[in-house]
Structure formats: C-alpha cells, structure tokens
Amino acid sequence: IPGFKPWTSEDGKVDITVEHLLTHSSGIDPYLNVKSFVEKYGENQPDSLVRYISDNAGRNFRPGTKFMYSCLNFIALQAILEKVTGERLCDYAMENVFRPLGLNHTGYLPVGENPVIDLKYCAPTELQHEGAPLCGQVHDPLARRINGGNSGNAGVFSDAMGLSVICAAIMNGGTANGVSILSPSAIDLMTRVPEDIDGGVGRALGWDHHSTHSGPRGDLFDRESTICHTGYTGPSIVIDMKNRIALIILTHRVHPQDKGSLARFRAVIANIIASSMMTSSCGKPGI
C-alpha cells in the first residue's frame, strides 16, 4: 500500500498489503483511544484517522504471521476503496450492492442524509450519558464519532431478509435476485484462507474461517467449508458453502449496557441447525 508505514525489525521491513488487512494479519493496533483522538483532532475527522493509521498506529508483528482483529484494518480498506472509486463507502455500497439486490432496508446512516431505513426498524443499543439509548446510529464510537457513521469497520443497518439475500449471493457465486455483485472467482477467494498467509491465522478475506473468533460456527459445521462473522453488538452470520446453509442471528448484547455475552448462545444455535441438517440428510440424529 503506497505511503503506508511497513513493519520493521532487525531483519528488515515487510510491507502491509490489502490481503493482510482483509485477513486481520497486518499487525496494526486493534483500535485507538477515541476520547484522546477527538480531543486532539475533533469529531468527524476521517482524513486525520486515515493518516493516523497509515503513519502512527502500532505495528505489532510481522504481517501475515498472526491473527489480531483490528477495526483499523477495515478503515484502511475503506480509504483505499474510496480513493479508487472516488465515492464514499456508504454511497458505493448502496449503488453497487444494496440497491441492485433490492435491499430496501439495508444501508448506512439511518440518521443522516437521505435515510433509507425507518428508525422504527432500528433496535436501540447502549444507553448514553444523557440517559437515552443510541437508535439509528452506529454503536461503535470510532465509526460514529470520528467517521461520522460512514465507516469500514461498522455502520451497516439491515434486517434478516436483506442479509439472507447477501448470503444467497455468496453461496451462489456472487449472484442473487438475478444480479451479480461479485464474480465466482472472487467468491472463491474470499471464502478460503489465502495460501501465502500462515495457516494459524485462520482468516479468509473478510470472513472468519477457523481462527480463535470462529466460535459462532459451533462444533458441527464443516471447518473447511464454513465461514462466519460477528458484529460487536451481537449479530452473527454463519455460511456453510458446501451445504448451502446460512444462519443469521440478529440480536444484541449491549442494551441497556455493554455487559452481555452471546458466545455460548451463538454456538448452541449453530449446533442445533447443523445437527438438524445432518438428521435430514442422513435420516438419523446427527448428535
């Protein structure tokens, strides 16, 4: 990535690539202190945030050798996409993914210009200092306060129907509702661990494959053919590419306070779905 500070050590330097960002193997700091950043630069400062990630954020290990989830990775990817396309991420996603697929309740910025999502469909999240919960605003403070809701790490609002169409596109070689959003080769690349990334990383391009974050998959879905991802507030998606099954859980753990855990819940639901699939295909209980 031109102009991006590399990893340096006594053995020399290693450049960070787009693949490292997508697989969370870049070694870049997981997050930043939002309060300190806002005090220094102010709110709604996406350009300052990108410069911080490029020049100042810590590089913690040699890229491609370990997994460490980082919101900064996907904000860097957002900056690259916006530079290449000349569009904001929220607009590009709407014009090239959400609207072509007919997703009428999916998008960024329900509270903002030209909202496409009615606030009555937005679940409230954490109570704020003034006593009211966030509703229709992305929960993640970095995405909300520094990126203004248009952010690569968080901020898409959707419903189960909309997400099911996206899952169908992924399972069908990039096509759903008669519209192609990605090529079959792109889907193949994004659903497996890259060959040049250490196997212990366990991440596909944008998706979890078998890393330490693959708990939502449970114990029964096939490791080699299943990808998954979670959202910080609680939602999760599991996609079994081989058996063409998608599990979408839309619930959250941060209302009224950020104290809940859904780790066990997700795994149990995944096991129930996977075992029922085995029962229907084999004619006998799967567990």
Language model regions located:
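Acidic helix-start/capping segments at beta-turn-to-alpha-helix junctions
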Residues: I1-K5
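A generic structural signal for short coil/turn motifs at secondary-structure boundaries
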Residues: W7, A176, P256-G260
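Short, surface-exposed loop or secondary-structure junction motifs
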Residues: T8-E224
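Structured C-terminal helix/loop/strand segments within mature extracytoplasmic catalytic/sensor domains
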Residues: H229-I287
